[in-house]
């Protein structure tokens, strides 16, 4: 079982987009803002592919690629490549000896994940929108990162949309959640019964909420990183919490993109000298 990952978009949100495929009204820049209904919108065209190249400004370590709120089907695939050269994704110029990107996952001068399914597991047709997760292991450090979407034959004229992109190195605490963590739906729908016994309902949107606790005797462990998250994300800037990146069958159910519901303090119970931090995250919008 992997430990929890807590990711923020600071590395990718500061990126410059140097190449893009997009439709008017659906710019690729929307991938770098925390409003998943404002989407990157593109029609792949005859080659069935659409891509965006991001300049992170400097060589940046990336261990997680997250593409959220997509309308990907079960056959939609994506690929992440990386280079330290702005033209590093041009197969005619990337290699000094003239060789091109192939299907291998890594090269001496860059990174190539190869095409993989956007859906982390099968049977996600009950979700309105699906998140894609890509664990980049070992971690890769490059300046330029390319996202490519590939649709199935016959879907080249279909519209593809995605609402959020993360590229970065999430915080993975060396301790896992303590027993008792919870993930579930909140439903604010109105339900009342009339004096005559008739039920009236007013349907409202649902969203998920995750609550978990980290505890350890190492003071630096909890104070340093949690203070950074509190200071930089607060309760209004988005974060992504992934319970277990290595369990694709539950990645959709056990990962929440949203905001911290509260900034709980680090508690020091006496006399145990164990530092405890409770986390709450509420979903931005149900996918």
Predicted segments, located by residue:
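Extracellular/virion structural assembly segments
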Residues: 1-50, 55-287
């Amino acid at each position: 079982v992997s430990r929890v990952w807590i990711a923020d978009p600071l590395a990718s949100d500061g990126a410059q987009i140097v190449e893009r495929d997009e439709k008017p009204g659906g710019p690729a820049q929307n991938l770098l803002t925390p409003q998943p209904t404002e989407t990157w919108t593109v029609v792949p065209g005859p080659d069935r592919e659409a891509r965006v190249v991001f300049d992170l400004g400097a060589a940046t370590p990336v261990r997680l690629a997250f593409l959220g709120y997509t309308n990907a089907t079960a056959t939609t695939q994506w690929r992440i490549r990386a280079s330290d050269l702005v033209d590093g994704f041009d197969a005619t110029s990337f290699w000094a000896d003239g060789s091109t990107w192939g299907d291998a996952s890594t090269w001496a001068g860059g990174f190539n994940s190869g095409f993989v399914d956007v859906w982390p597991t099968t049977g996600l047709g009950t979700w309105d929108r699906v998140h894609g997760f890509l664990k980049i292991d070992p971690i890769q450090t490059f300046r330029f990162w390319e996202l490519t979407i590939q649709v199935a034959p016959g879907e080249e004229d279909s519209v593809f949309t995605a609402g959020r992109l993360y590229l970065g190195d999430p915080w993975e605490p060396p301790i896992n959640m303590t027993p008792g963590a919870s993930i579930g739906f909140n439903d604010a729908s109105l339900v009342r019964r009339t004096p005559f016994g008739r039920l009236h309902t007013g349907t409202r949107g649902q969203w998920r909420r995750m609550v978990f606790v980290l505890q350890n005797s190492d003071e630096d462990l909890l104070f340093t990183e949690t203070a950074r998250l509190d200071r930089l994300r607060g309760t209004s800037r988005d974060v992504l919490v992934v319970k277990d990146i290595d369990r694709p069958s539950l990645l959709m159910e056990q990962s929440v993109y949203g905001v911290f519901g509260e900034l709980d303090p680090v508690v020091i119970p006496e006399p145990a000298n164990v530092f405890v931090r409770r986390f709450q995250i509420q979903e931005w919008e149900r996918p």
